[in-house]
Amino acid sequence: YGEGFYTFFMEVTRLSDSVDLLNITVSERLISNMDLSIGKEIIVLGQLRSYNKFVDGSNKLILTVFARNIEPCIEKSKNPNEIFLDGYICKEPVYRKTPFGREIADVLLAVNRAYNKSDYIPTIAWGRNSRFCQTLEVGDNIRVWGRLQSREYQKKISETEVVKKIAYEVSISKMERVTEESLNNEGHEDT
């Protein structure tokens, strides 16, 4: 379509002062007269997209925020990194306990969008939400609220070699299973 796209990384600081490094994709048309120099504070609204990229001999799932709007940040938000997803479980959730005793569940969500496309989004649930994930089955429709996070981890390549990698995932703070009943009740207030 003759439209160019740019990608860049954006740092978002959590309440804990940890920093998430988010991958942003934006049309040149959205940023033609903007100053996006390093250190500029901006607000990005968009959709989380995924695609496979062949890297180092294997496919890697890439997550990017496809920007719909970018504007200068005038006033900082208390919760600057929020996401909502409505999708379908496409792989059996994996529940486990970490070496520190935290309960977590990895859930892969397929989120449908226009033109018969889907984005596959890795998510992670904690505590009681991770236990709830044990009741979910492939094909279940769920809604999740949370934040997009980047997490550094060590991958063991051999007995002597370890490489540093970054995982991108949605950290779930609230979730619900979508049922016929919940769909029928939407938009109806109890009086």
Language-model features and meaning:
Residues Y1-T191:
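Single-stranded nucleic acid-binding surfaces, predominantly the OB-fold ssDNA-binding core
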